[in-house]
Structures are given as C-alpha cells and as structure tokens.
Curated annotation (Swiss-Prot):
Glycans are attached at residues 23, 153, 253, 350, 379, 492, 667, 799, 803. This is Beta-galactosidase. Belongs to the glycosyl hydrolase 35 family. Gene3D superfamilies: 2.60.120.740, Galactose-binding domain-like, Glycosidases. It is an enzyme of class 3 (hydrolase).
Length: 828
C-alpha cells in the first residue's frame, strides 16, 4: 500500500514537472537582444509601481499600457513597505505583489521585477526600512555583514514568493528579467575597494537564487557576469554596454520628472520623448522601459526626498489618476506599432549607417526578407532636406523619421498627429462648503510646558534613531534654570538652533516662538528667534518635522535628520555676546503627536476619545489642529480629487486611509517658467517647467476604492501650519477639451474619454497656427467649412476618426503645393 502511494505521488510530481516545463519560457540574451524561446525580441516596457496606485486600478492601468503598445510592465519592490518591522511582513492591499504580477500575466504581458532592494524612486529612504539603519554597526550598500544578511534575507523572500506562485518565465510565469541593486555605478567610487567587492557579492548572491531568467544591473558599467548592465537617463542613444556580449538596454527613460515641494511642474514634450526612443532603436537598442509609464500617488508617508510631493505624476503617458496623457500616450503608441513591425530587421538585420551631413544620419537594418530605416537629425536648430535612396525627405530639427520599408516615411517624432487632451476639474453636486468639526492637538500644553516624553537622553539624538520613522514629528524638550547672576542673563536674549529638521517649530515657556521651513534645498540651517525667558526654570520644546527621508546618494542613510545642534541661548549685552550651550543637557523626546497616537483619523477611533469634536467657532489659521467633515462620493466613475487650496501643511485621510501629505501653501518660484516650450535640444528637469508662482500641489487624488458609493464618507485633516478648511472641495477629473493637429494624408482621431463630443470650437484646414486654446486660421483655407465637416463627423459621438485630405476638406488653389494641416479644437 505504501509502495502504491509512493508510486502515485511520484507520477503526480512527474506530471506536474512536465506540465511546468511544457509551459516554461526560455529567456536569455546575446549581443543584440533579449531572446525569448530562442528568438530575439524588441521589448517595450513601462514602469507602474503597484503601491502608487490601488489594486482596483491595476487592471485598467495595465490594459492602457498594453493598448499603448507595451508588452512588458516593470516595477520596483519596496522593502520598507513590505517589512516595516524586522521579520514582520505586509503584502496586503496595494502591497500585494503577487496579485500585481498575476494581473500583468492575465493581460498577456511580461514583467521585469527590480528587487533592488535599494530602489531610490523618490521613495522614503530609498526603500530601506529605518529599523535597518538602527541595527548595531550598520552601513548600507557595502561590505557589512549585518546589511548583507538582511538584504539577502529580503531578496530571497521575494524570490521564493515568486517561485511559489510560478511567476518566473522559467516556470511559465511573466517575469522575464530581475534586477539586483540599483544605480550603484553612480556612487561606487565613494565606497572604494569595498564597493567593488560589494557589487561582486550582489551578483553572486543573486545568481545563487537560481531564478531561471537573466539578472540586470542598471547604471553599472562592467557589471559582474552574468549580470547585464543597462542604461538610465533622458537619452541612451550614445550608450554602449561595457560587455560586448550584452544587448543595448535602457531601463529608465525618464518620461518627465518628479516634483519637490516649492518646485515647478515639469513637462517633457511628446516630441522629445519620442525622439529619444527612436534614436535609441536607430542606434541598436532593443529593450526600452519608460520611467514612469504611470507615476501615481505617494499615499501616506512614502514620499522620499526630502520634500518629494504626494503626486508622483511624472508627466507620464498615463497621468496620476490613470487617464491618457495626450498627446504623449498616443504619439508613442504610433511609434511602438512601427517598431514592433520592424522587429526582425532591428534584431537580426545587418546594420549600416550613412552620414548625410549637418548632424543627419540614416541607419539601415537589412535582412534577406526586409529592410527598415531611420533618418535621424540631431541638429537642435536646423531642419534638414536630405536625399536618401534617391528620394527627398524633410527631417525637422531634433527628430527621427521612421521608414519601415526604407521607402516611405511612416512617422516622424516631431510631427504629432495625436490629439491633445485638456484635463479639467469638474465640480460635484455636493453643497459648495463642507460642514466641519474640529479639535486642537490635545495635551500639547503638557508637552510644551512639562516636557513629558517617551525617552530621556543626554544630548541631541538624530530623529531617525528615536522615531524609527514611525512619525514625521518628534519633540525635543529640555529645561534650563536661569537667575539674575547667570552671565547670559539680559533683556535681549535669543534661541539659536542649528538644525536639519525639514520644518522646525519652537516653543519657549509654552509660547510659540516661530518656525523655519527649508527652502532651496538648504537642509542645514540656523534658526534664531528672540525669546522671553524668566528667572527660574524655563521650558524649551522644539518640534522637528520630517518631510520624507533622503533616498539617494552615497552613504545617504547616515545623513542627519532632526536637530543635530548645537542648541544655544544667546544673550546680547551691548557689544558682548554670551552663549549658553544646551546641546549636552538632558533632553526628553516625544515621538509623534497625540492625535496621531490616538488615531483621530481612524473611523474606529476618531469618535471614541474623551475629547469631543467641536462644531462651533471653526478656527482658521490655527496651528496643530484636526478637522473632520462628512461628504457623499461624487457620482460616476471619473477620478476624484480634493482641492485643498487654502490649507497650510499637514496630512489628509479619507475614511481612515491616508492619501498623503499636503502643502498647498508652498508656492513655486515666480521665475524659470516658459510660455512656449521648444521640444528641440536636450531635455533637463528645468526645461519647459510651468506653474511658476503657484502651489506645487493643490489637488490630491482620492481613489474610488477609498470611497463608499452609498452613505457618508469622512475626510480628516491634520493641519500643522494653520489654514482655512472652508475652501476644501471635492471634484472629478474629466476631459474638458480636445485639440488635434494633423498633417495632410494622415488621420486625426478625437476622443473625449467616454464623454460625448459636444461642440466644435475651432477647425481649419490649410496653414493654421497657434497652440491648443489659441488656434488661429492662416492665409490659406480649404474650400469647405472645416467646422461643419468636423461637426458632422464628431458631435454627439464618444470618438471619431477623419482622413486629413483636400478631398475631405476641399482644395484651394491659393494654398499652392505647400503642406497643409488640420487644426481642431472640440469641447467635451
């Protein structure tokens, strides 16, 4: 009987193994490309970070990425989110990594899993848990036994989770590549010989995990074998792998840029982004990933920096809420379709490059069956008229023309035929003003007068070491006794604090002295305010506030946070200055604020504390206050936002779930923006910035899954700086207007994102000019009324498609042979 059971079990295991092998995918590489089941592939990937959206959003985001022409989704794995306390793991909700990978698989796409576990990503502390920093003798990202043990433990856990669910391609899953470490080549020189030894250890450790697919290391020249090195940046056309047997791969094509509090809004044109992609494939690239394809939202306190905003929109092809960012999404989709059609020549063809002069080159990829060509003009100012294979081509400055058959131009990166969608905020049907209740941050007086804390230490301690990043807030409290005989005593005294707190609030004897906010990245500063002291005991309470922990740079984990001192009382007696250093005094430390500790934002806890919420005398501009209001969820399925204009700084919760930090009172500089953006020339994060002199972030994403469709919802605010909640409003995000520019002999497609096209505001066929919202007819017009033509085709429809031709819009002899274009603006 036992033998029979053994034989049946053995047969079952053999069948399972055979089934797994039959469905497995062999992923490898050669010098040209990643190979899948022995075939070289063009792979088009996009970054979607699972914790920066909700699990309900994942299918739609992935579907839109697929519709946009991607075949691969890339994500980091966020260590501090999954292991907030040592050996205590969280893979629930939007941290359900397995579910995310399976959602990718269900869509028929591949996945790239960047385990790191250092991620940078403008994520708090670069993805490292702060408890790791607080372990004895700890140093990150170098030969350090404690760090290496913890890194290997987490990496192994993630790998085993993927293996248990058969998610690697070698098991029949979607994961075709995995990444160990991240951009270490940018900092390796700071670590000396130990840096080289560490990266070798990373490679050996990763390779020992036997995942059955290749490992990559981004920004890692001369990566240890068998790791594949890759490129990150705005452009990687000039990149060449150090290892001649490695393919040319681009793991981060930055589609825009992130925002800092106090910073302007970044914008990278569709023309320039498409140019960077086409140039990369023209010069031999075969794998390209958009960072980000969907940026999303830094919910809760996950934003890093310091000073990274709650919005992580990144000007990506899918905006923060999951809408198509047009024309970027559509312009890239057209390019992706062509690149996929050219896959065989690009991966197997012989390559020849022809210099056509004045920074223009033609590249021919040729097989026996097919040839495909690119004509690239990297001149940032001059258009080019070139003759190639006996035909003339007009190639605008800073653009690439794509010729799938080496004869007819099918696409040019500078000629955008895709619509531009103007996203607007639509007011909801709710009453304009919410009915608020409020309460102060209770027992604050106990803290600032008595110095009652959680920890007592002699001297000043770094904020990370005390809080373990459990809170943005840490009280530093001490007492000092003064009498008339004290040498420092005078009528003119001040408090001087050398600080690395991102925001500092100071109290002396229960009185608020003032605050200091870091501006222009000057995180090491001196705070000094005049104070009124008394004979006897004086109480000092300093509230240090962090706004995201540093996430990048060599040894960034040891960068100071909080009040590092010295802290001094300064007495001025005529020309004489006398200082009393309090840095080595006994200090009391209190982690967090009482409202946070009692979870006033929680739906379970908020109504059960002994202090009631008040409905009377709603205060404005009151520091350290809590506000709460009920509201109904906006109707429909459009994304929901909350307008926090009028508030100062703090955190906001919807039904107990944090949607992030807010700071609408922090405006960007009045300088550095441009009214018109020239796509030509190299892009940088400051180029084409807009929204100068405006709040860095005014609107905050409220995921639909956070809301109750029926009944009441609750918004809770903690206001740190003082603001007016009466101006807070909920709105939905909709496509308000759509514009399009299309060259003759192309098609124009218009869509209002599931809303009907209601009217044609402008249409002209000929030589119109201007930008969306300010189009103007030119000197040459088609014979037919373009507005009527477009209205007949489009009004009342969710979308419409038209051929742009003289036959459709009428010819006009006055236009001559000059190229004609159609400009259209419709209302939704």
């Amino acid at each position: 009987m036992k033998m029979k059971q053994f034989n049946l079990l053995s047969l079952f295991l053999i069948l399972i193994t055979s089934f797994g092998s039959a469905n497995s995918t062999i992923v490898s590489h050669d010098e040209r490309a990643i190979t899948i089941d022995g075939q070289r592939r063009i792979l088009l990937s996009g970054s979607i970070h699972y914790p920066r959206s909700t699990s309900d959003m994942w299918p739609d985001l992935i579907s839109k990425a697929k519709d946009g022409g991607l075949d691969t989704i890339e994500t980091y794995v966020f260590w501090n989110a999954h292991e907030p306390s040592r050996r205590q793991y969280d893979f629930s909700g939007n941290l359900d990594l397995v579910r995310f990978i399976k959602t990718i698989q269900s869509a028929g796409l591949y996945s790239v899993l960047r385990i790191g576990p250092y991620v940078c990503a403008e994520w708090n502390y670069g993805g490292f848990p702060v408890w790791l920093h607080n372990m004895p003798d700890m140093k990150f990202r170098t030969i350090n036994p404690g760090f290496m043990n913890e890194m290997q433990n987490f990496t192994t856990k993630i790998v085993n989770m993927m293996k248990e669910e058969s998610l690697f391609a070698s098991q029949g899953g979607p994961i075709i590549l995995a990444q160990i470490e991240n951009e270490y080549g940018n900092v390796i020189s700071s670590y000396g010989a130990e840096g080289k030894a560490y990266i070798d250890w990373c490679a050996n450790m990763a390779n020992s995990l036997d995942i059955g697919v290749p490992w990559i290391m981004c920004q890692q020249p001369h990566a240890p074998q068998p790791m594949i090195e890759t490129c990150n940046g705005f452009y990687c056309d000039q990149y060449k792998p150090s290892n001649p047997s490695s393919p040319k791969m681009w793991t981060e094509n930055w589609t825009g840029w992130f925002k800092n509090w106090g910073g302007k809004h970044p914008y990278r044109t569709a023309e320039d982004l498409a140019f960077s992609v086409a140039r990369f494939f023209q010069t031999g690239g075969t794998f390209q990933n958009y960072y980000m394809y969907h940026g999303g939202t830094n919910f809760g306190r996950v934003a890093g920096g310091p000073y990274i905003t709650t919005s992580y929109d990144y000007d990506a092809p899918l905006d923060e809420y999951g809408n198509l960012n047009q024309p970027k999404w559509g312009h890239l989709k057209q390019l992706h379709t062509l690149l996929k059609s050219m896959e065989k020549p690009l991966t197997y063809g012989n390559i020849s490059t022809i210099d056509l002069g004045n920074s223009v080159t033609a590249t021919v990829y040729s097989t026996n069956e097919k040839s495909s060509c690119f004509i690239g003009n990297v001149n940032a100012t001059a258009d080019a008229l070139v003759n190639f294979k006996g035909k003339d081509y007009n190639v605008p400055a800073w653009s690439v023309s794509v010729l799938p058959d080496c004869d007819k131009e099918a696409y040019n990166t500078a000629r955008v035929n895709t619509q531009t969608s103007i996203i607007t905020e639509d007011s909801c049907d709710e009453p304009e003003k919410l009915k608020w209740t409020w309460r102060p941050e209770f027992t604050t007086q106990k803290t600032i007068l008595k110095g009652s804390g959680d920890l007592i230490a002699k001297g000043l301690v770094d904020q990370k070491d005390v809080t373990n990043d459990a809170s943005d807030y840490l009280w530093y409290m001490t007492r000092v006794h003064l009498d008339k005989k004290d040498p420092i005593w005078s009528r003119n005294m001040s408090l001087r604090v050398h600080s690395n707190a991102h925001v500092l609030h100071a109290y002396v004897n229960g009185k608020y002295v003032g605050n200091q906010i870091v501006r222009d990245n000057k995180f090491d500063y001196r705070f000094e305010k005049k104070v009124n002291l008394v004979h006897g005991t004086n109480h000092l309470a300093l509230l240090s506030v962090s706004v995201g922990l540093q996430n990048y740079g060599p040894f960034f984990e040891s960068g100071p946070t909080g009040i590092n001192g010295p802290v001094k009382l300064v007495g001025y007696k005529g020309d004489e200055t006398i200082e009393k250093d309090l840095s080595k005094h006994q200090w009391d430390y209190k982690i967090g604020l009482n409202g946070f500790n009692h979870k006033l934002f929680s739906m379970k806890s908020a109504g059960h504390h002994h202090r009631k919420w008040s409905t009377e005398k709603l205060p404005a501009d009151r520091m350290l206050s809590w506000y709460k209001a009920n509201f109904k969820a906006p109707l429909g399925k459009d994304p929901v936002i909350v307008d926090l204009n009028g508030l100062g700084k703090g955190e906001v919760w919807i039904n107990g779930q944090s949607i992030g930090r807010y700071w609408p009172s922090f405006n960007s500089s009045d300088e550095g923006c441009t009214e018109e953006c020239d796509y030509r020339g190299e892009y940088g994060s400051d180029k084409c910035a807009f929204m100068c002199g405006k709040p860095t972030q005014r609107w905050y994403h409220v995921p639909r899954s956070f809301l109750n469709d029926k009944g009441h919802n609750t918004i809770t605010l903690f206001e740190e700086m003082g603001g007016d909640p009466s101006m807070v409003k909920f709105k939905t995000v909709v496509t308000g207007r759509v514009c399009a520019k299309a060259h003759e002999h192309n098609k124009v497609e218009l869509s209002c994102n599931n809303r009907p096209i209601s009217a044609v505001k402008f249409a002209s066929f000929g030589n119109p000019s201007g930008q969306c919202g300010s189009f103007a007819a030119g000197s040459c017009e088609g014979a037919k009324d373009a507005v009527k033509v477009v209205a007949k085709e489009c009004v009342g429809k969710l979308n419409c498609t038209m051929n742009v031709s003289s036959h459709k819009f009428g010819s006009n002899l006055d236009c001559g042979d000059s190229p004609k274009r159609l400009f259209v603006e419709v209302e939704c």
